[in-house]
């Protein structure tokens, strides 16, 4: 477990570093946009603009190298294509997560309802069979025992 803890700490550190790099790149592009808007056209301003552009290209290059490093813990992180599509569409990936969790919850509730309904049907049918055919009580109880969950999942809420 200690190896997993170390790997998790390394992954968290790499994620934090990558997040800082992305934030820095975004901030640089915002600054670049402001600089372009207010660009006076002087040779000094042109030189500063080129320096700023080169800094942005270098930051993007470092981020690209980091993200494609096979030794990095980040190479083992899979991001669902749907999340990437959400981001490309300008949507918040947290919305994807919330909608996904809600869909799973609805599906679980539906499945739980089906299981509960089938259990009631099984028990009702078993009662009717035993009432009409008392000699089948033992096989019916065996069937109920074999078709009942080991841990009482249906009673958990």
Swiss-Prot record:
The encoding gene: NUT2
Function, as annotated: Component of the Mediator complex, a coactivator involved in the regulated transcription of nearly all RNA polymerase II-dependent genes. Mediator functions as a bridge to convey information from gene-specific regulatory proteins to the basal RNA polymerase II transcription machinery. The Mediator complex, having a compact conformation in its free form, is recruited to promoters by direct interactions with regulatory proteins and serves for the assembly of a functional preinitiation complex with RNA polymerase II and the general transcription factors.
Chain segments annotated as coiled-coil in the UniProt record: none
Note in the entry: Present with 1472 molecules/cell in log phase SD medium.
Keywords for the protein's UniProt record, in alphabetical order: Activator, Nucleus, Transcription, Transcription regulation
Protein name: Mediator of RNA polymerase II transcription subunit 10
Subunit structure: Component of the Mediator complex, which is composed of at least 21 subunits that form three structurally distinct submodules. The Mediator head module contains MED6, MED8, MED11, SRB4/MED17, SRB5/MED18, ROX3/MED19, SRB2/MED20 and SRB6/MED22, the middle module contains MED1, MED4, NUT1/MED5, MED7, CSE2/MED9, NUT2/MED10, SRB7/MED21 and SOH1/MED31, and the tail module contains MED2, PGD1/MED3, RGR1/MED14, GAL11/MED15 and SIN4/MED16. The head and the middle modules interact directly with RNA polymerase II, whereas the elongated tail module interacts with gene-specific regulatory proteins.
Organism domain of life: Eukaryota
Subcellular localization(s) per the UniProt record: Nucleus
InterPro entries: Mediator_Med10
GO cellular component: core mediator complex; mediator complex; nucleus
Family: Belongs to the Mediator complex subunit 10 family.
